[in-house]
Amino acid sequence: MRNLDNIPRIDEIEVNFNYKTKFDSEEFARQLKDQEKGMNELTVYEYQQNRKRFIDEGRAIEGNAAQQAAREKALSKKIEELFESGMSWEEAEGKAASWLKTQAALHNPDQIAGGNPLHIGGLGDKRINSSLGSQWRYRIDIVDEQIKELEKSLTLEQRKNTYLNVKLTY
């Protein structure tokens, strides 16, 4: 992990998402904050490369294996946690399997937003993850347009050393 204090950043880009009251507000805020943090750990160059790959190829297939590994690890951890809390092993397996059905392995940020397909930031409510993912389709152009304009004034070296400055709100 890079030390991201006192580094060159672009001017702030704000992107607003729609929150639906059917979702847990704390979980929605957590997932959005994790997406923001992930974006702000990208250089302009990394963002551009990841976006180009996503536009050209869609979701990267290697991201599926990373997500599956994260889900398996979380399932094992959940079974252990429930077993240690006093459940039988069989009951813990059943409860953990039910819990896992509600969870998605989270890219931070989503691949559509320039995320690395191998970077999984944990699990979270899959309905919220799906909502955020679908909203990116209509919001990523805001970021792309500003980065494209900024690119004109940055050298390649500057793009490799200047970080995003994105604020995700709802």
Predicted feature locations:
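Nuclease and nuclease-like effector domains acting on nucleic acids or nucleotide cofactors
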Residues: 1-105, 109-170
